[in-house]
């Protein structure tokens, strides 16, 4: 029974975004970064980008045993490792530290940018509310094995517009995070996501906690709120306002779109900061 339980729940808790989402976020970040860097030595080459994106996608999509025993949720408490029945590592922090160490010790170009891709994978996942709150996403008895936010499509045109063509925002990201390490990037990205979850839903007497409800203990798992695991879908739940007994969000509601766009923008921003950090080291600056 224990083995069956671990098999069922472990397979669905390991990662947030799937490979194609990670790849798209990575390519957007590299394109904007390269466009805004004047020094040719600081730009990512096609080969470096390929190593980074490939490792990122493989970490998201592959590895039965990795997915079974590492769930990679964020610990908002003290960021120490947590386990389930001394078998399953439920938090990502120890594994992330190992990846950063591997990156720092990398000798070959292939190892260096592959390890960067694995680090970036975790940074991007910190824009997934269910992985930061965190909320355990498995509902296998309902044939529901993931958080629906993680499947929400990326609006690439909107991201391009928000990042801008004049490089002011990208340059600001690079400058502002010049002394920011990968561990701090992880924490800052997670904190931004958690603050967004606690933010108001425009026009409704609720915060986004109606979807992902944190536990009062920051070291414990939260749960789905009154709206359930229905991000992006039509959903209705009891309102706090007696004149409007039901709050309703529609399929692909503009409120969903704006929330997702902000999270995806933050994923691109933290990716730019991470790859800029490695490129500075490579260039010796």
What annotation goes with each model-predicted range?
Residues 1-9:
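Bacterial N-terminal signal peptides
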Residues 10-118, 125, 129-285:
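N-terminal, motif-rich segments that launch catalysis or mediate targeting to/interaction with membranes
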């Amino acid at each position: 029974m224990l083995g069956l339980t671990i098999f069922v729940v472990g397979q669905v808790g390991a990662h947030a975004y799937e490979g194609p989402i990670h790849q798209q976020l990575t390519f957007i970040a590299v394109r904007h970064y390269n466009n805004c860097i004047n020094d040719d030595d600081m730009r990512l080459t096609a080969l470096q980008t390929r190593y980074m994106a490939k490792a990122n996608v493989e970490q998201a999509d592959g590895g039965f045993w990795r997915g079974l025993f590492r769930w990679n949720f964020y610990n908002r408490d003290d960021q120490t490792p947590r386990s389930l029945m001394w078998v399953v590592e439920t938090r990502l922090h120890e594994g992330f530290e190992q990846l950063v160490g591997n990156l720092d010790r990398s000798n070959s170009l292939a190892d260096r940018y592959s390890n960067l891709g694995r680090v970036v994978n975790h940074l991007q996942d910190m824009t997934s509310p269910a992985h930061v709150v965190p909320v355990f996403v498995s509902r296998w008895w309902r044939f529901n094995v993931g958080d629906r936010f993680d499947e929400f499509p990326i609006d690439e045109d909107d991201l391009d517009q928000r990042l801008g063509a004049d490089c002011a925002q990208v340059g600001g990201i690079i400058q502002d995070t010049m002394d920011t390490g990968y561990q701090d990037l992880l924490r800052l990205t997670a904190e931004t996501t958690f603050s967004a979850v606690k933010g108001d839903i425009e026009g409704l007497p609720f915060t986004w906690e109606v979807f992902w409800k944190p536990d009062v203990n920051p070291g414990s798992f939260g749960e789905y709120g009154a709206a359930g695991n229905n991000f992006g879908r039509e959903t209705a739940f009891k309102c706090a306002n007696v004149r409007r007994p039901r709050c309703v969000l529609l399929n692909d509601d503009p409120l969903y779109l704006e929330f997702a766009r902000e999270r995806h923008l933050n994923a691109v921003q933290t990716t730019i900061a991470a790859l800029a950090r490695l490129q500075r080291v490579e260039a010796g600056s």
